[in-house]
Amino acid sequence: MSEDHGKDYTLEADSELRFEIEHKDAKVLVSLVSGFAELFGTELVKKKQYEFGVGAKVAIFTYQGCVLHVSGKMDVCYISKETPMVQYVNCHTALEQFRMEAEEKDRHGPVAMVVGPMDVGKSTLCRILLNYAVRVGRRPLYADLDVGQGSIAISGNVATILIERPANVEEGFSKTAPLVYHFGHKSPGANSILYNAVVSKMAEVTLHSLNSNKRTKSSGIIINTCGWVKGSGYAHLLHAAKAYGACAIFVLDQERLYNELLRDVPKGVHVVLLPKSGGVVERSKEQRHEARDQRVKEYFYGNARAPFYPFSFEVKFQDLRLYKIGAPPLPDSCMPLGMKAEDNKTKVVAVTPTPALIHHVLALSFSESVEDDVIGTNVAGFCCVTEVDMERQAVMLLSPQPRPLPPNALLLWSELQFMDNHT
């Protein structure tokens, strides 16, 4: 569908305008002409023009009715009156009740998890709940446990940020000063023991940090989770709920998961089944891969509105302190006395540079030694291996910071790869 000269869309109360952009060079401009509207919980400013590009899947909702002016090339564009936004705002109202009680009694605010299979709108619901909380003066923490399609850090990591202002309509939440823990894989199943250890550590630190500010303490935490909800994936959800002490679990679009959680979580935990929005779009494997790639590209190069200019520099093998968490499995009979096979899953092992290292993203740990708690230490940032020269015994790194690497820099291997073809 092509909208070359622009068009006004009149929305009735409790309806939303949905559109998708798939063409690479397409650009869609939206402005609020009259009334009130919001995008995933962020209010639109009247007469201000918002720009959306390729990959955008937008749903602009109005509680009272509005007129929107839209111009540009869209693949899909329609108005829907079937929207779960009223149920989502009811969830916010319930959480706000918990926050008011926590404020009165000087206790931790609610910890709410959003769970469900892939492509049901989990991160969107998190964004809505966080935006609504901020709009009534709260300062919640946002924890993202989705290592496949993270919304705070690049894939292969879990992360937490403090939300102090509503998400930017075009770019989402500010990613300033996130707390990031390295996992190194795109699925928890690659190393379940390590994933649980990393989640437990981040939960411990996040819950402790609630005490640093009275407003944050009563505001609580919103947690986004992976879309793997069966077998070991379900066990990871239970582990996260226990580690964070979740008091509410919002289940999107899966009755089976809802009933399993009702059966398995403590009686005091509120489990709520919610419908997914009709605007949620299923993504193919290729689209997921592209989204991961785009996140890494933005980490190093920024975007059109705020470009970054990363550095490339050489590091000799002898100066490279490179490790991987998790050693190949061994049978119990081959393990040292007192060690179990699963201990290998959290072992920090040295990595010898080879040409296979090219394109891999490496995490820079705040740990200075492998004697430290490497798993329980957050990371400072990331770099990418763009070249491996076996003859010169050196690697070329793409980094947001200029040379040299920090003294005692400890780099952690990740299975995430990024082809740096930026020109």
Curated annotation (Swiss-Prot):
SUPFAM superfamilies: P-loop containing nucleoside triphosphate hydrolases. Its main location: nucleus. The keyword Nucleotide-binding applies. Gene3D superfamilies: Clp1, DNA binding domain, P-loop containing nucleotide triphosphate hydrolases, Pre-mRNA cleavage complex subunit Clp1, C-terminal domain. ATP binds at residues 16, 57, 119-124. The keyword Mitochondrion does not apply. Keywords: ATP-binding, mRNA processing, Nucleotide-binding, Nucleus. One of its GO terms (molecular function) is ATP binding. Signal peptide: none annotated. It is found in: Nucleus. GO terms for biological process: mRNA 3'-end processing; tRNA splicing, via endonucleolytic cleavage and ligation. Required for endonucleolytic cleavage during polyadenylation-dependent pre-mRNA 3'-end formation. This is Protein CLP1 homolog. It comes from Drosophila erecta (Fruit fly). The gene is cbc.
